[in-house]
Amino acid sequence: MAARSLMRILLVGLGLTLATIISGALVTISASATVCSSWPLCLEELVQSQNPLVWISLLHRLFVALALLAVFAGLVAVWRSSDTAGLPRITAGIAAAFFLLQALAGALLVWGVPAMVADVWHLSGALLAFGAQSLTIALIAVPTPATPERLAGRAAQMQRRLRSLAWWSAAAAGVAALAIGARSVVPGFGMMTAVPTNSVSAVGFAALLSVWMALEARRRLRPVAETPALALALPRYSLFLPALALLALLGAFIPVAGHLISLTAIALLWAATIIAAVILQRVPFSFATATAGVRSQPAWRTVVADYISLTKPKVISLLLVTTLTTMFITEAGLPSWWLVIWTMIGGYLAAGGAGAINCAFDSDIDINMGRTSRRPVPSGRISRRAAFIFGLILSVLSIIVLWVFTTPLAAFFALLGIIYYAWFYTGWLKRSTWQNIIIGGGAGAIPPLVGWTAVTGSVSLMAVVLFAIIFYWTPPHFWALALVKQKDYARAGVPMLPVVAGEAETRWQILVYSAIMVAVSLLPVAIGAMSWIYLIGAVVLGLRFMRDAWAVWRVGDQAAIWGLYKYSLLYLALVFAAMVADRLIIG
């Protein structure tokens, strides 16, 4: 089949799936889902009733039928095409499976199956099919280059950062779309109200990442001779991402019709970010770096950037993910929008303050390590005293914010985390024993306690389990990094496990602690806090983690070690995301 015909079929299927999503939202808003008592048609109601809601319901079912045919036609076309072997066939099959599931869920709703389960799958299945279709189209439209570009130095770093940001933006948009879609089954939030806080938070996070990616793409991307015409428009096309994100966010505050606006905008944003991510992953670009321009950065911007870097934003991002997701899985129900905002502000200030104090205390170590020697304090751009005072100010502000706007217990745990990391770990533990990572893991495991107590004001068994998951996740994650950077640690005199016990013992300990962590990750199900949805996610994610840990132990090369280190970051975020999904869907 010709490439143009194949693409036309796939685009028609994508458009019909979007029409299915929009018409389905219209059915829910108008409360016309119950006017038809039969499936797939409702001819009796159509003949006997003059109710216009019947036509809305029938229109939705028509779009479902047309989209189902188009999706499976696209699947057949992709499999018959000789140019689409591999990943596009898989994603096309996933799209067809999800769409079939959502169609069956719609039938179950009419037949009287428990509405919560069927309703979630009905809309979520369509959204997941839409995402898989978008990925299929992007993979076919943007083929892998025969000779991948070779970048080095700062340009390669920029490329990795922008690619990672693009995929995170796509993931965030997908979560936001599912959050909006699931709101109809959240107790206390009917479809005739504005979007509840969980959806607003998800949309806001997706909007933030999308805007960031759009700005970075416009600022950094430079086309080269091999850049195809489709990708040349990416820097300009990226401006539509903030517009879609803003539209999705604004729709969250408009009753009734706002749901339709938000759902449409976030679905389009999801498709757009997926396409952008594939383009950035596969298309050759050059990247403008800080040294490429003739204009130097103003002094005040450099100072601000240095102080921000003291807070270690990359490290903080994962801490805030665990804090945020924890807030949505407590037994207290969904937190308010303002509680989420103030907890995130307080959490950033606490983690940032501890990070700045760490930079002040560790400057003698950082200067001897290639990974950290260019930080502001060891390089002399900021004095140790200034870094310490800055960290102290942020820490005090964090306690005030959390105490005033959340709960005293959340402020207490934030203070405990600051002392644990900035003084106990940095000042003594890190320099004294190879068990620094094991014991020090408690510092990184405190953010879920902050999020939990900010919502509930108390600590429960589930909060302790969340602490334990991160506590046992920390050793395999950081020991993998220590294996890669063991020469730096040896030169700086830091007794990390690879320096003290060698590579073989470190690889074995990584496997052992990985197994413990995966076992601990199943405890939420054992104590009755989570259900089968989280169980499936935890098992799948855990098996992948154990596979990578096994590769580190048996093979032990740099590729295996880096693979585990990078996946461990994604693993932790996805495990907590699976808990949120379980709580929102099952309750």
From Swiss-Prot:
Gene name per UniProt: ctaB
GO biological process: heme A biosynthetic process; heme biosynthetic process; heme O biosynthetic process
Keywords assigned: Cell membrane, Heme biosynthesis, Membrane, Transferase, Transmembrane, Transmembrane helix
Broadest EC class assigned to this enzyme: transferase
Pfam families: COX15-CtaA (PF02628), UbiA (PF01040)
InterPro entries: COX15/CtaA_fam (IPR003780), Protohaem_IX_farnesylTrfase (IPR006369), UbiA_prenyltransferase (IPR000537), UbiA_prenylTrfase_CS (IPR030470), UbiA_sf (IPR044878)
Region (Protoheme IX prenyltransferase): 318-587
Stretches for region Unknown: 1-317
EC number: 2.5.1.141
Pathway participation: Porphyrin-containing compound metabolism; heme O biosynthesis; heme O from protoheme: step 1/1
Membrane topology according to the record: Multi-pass membrane protein
Transmembrane annotation, as ranges: 9-29, 58-78, 93-113, 123-143, 172-192, 195-215, 238-258, 260-280, 315-335, 337-357, 386-406, 409-429, 437-457, 464-484, 522-542, 560-580
Protein name: Protoheme IX farnesyltransferase
Cellular-component GO terms for this entry: plasma membrane
Primary location class: membrane
Catalytic activity: heme b + (2E,6E)-farnesyl diphosphate + H2O = Fe(II)-heme o + diphosphate
Functional note: Converts heme B (protoheme IX) to heme O by substitution of the vinyl group on carbon 2 of heme B porphyrin ring with a hydroxyethyl farnesyl side group.
PROSITE patterns: UBIA
Family statement: In the C-terminal section; belongs to the UbiA prenyltransferase family. Protoheme IX farnesyltransferase subfamily.
Molecular function terms from GO: oxidoreductase activity, acting on NAD(P)H, heme protein as acceptor; protoheme IX farnesyltransferase activity
Cellular location(s): Cell membrane
Note: Carbon 2 of the heme B porphyrin ring is defined according to the Fischer nomenclature.
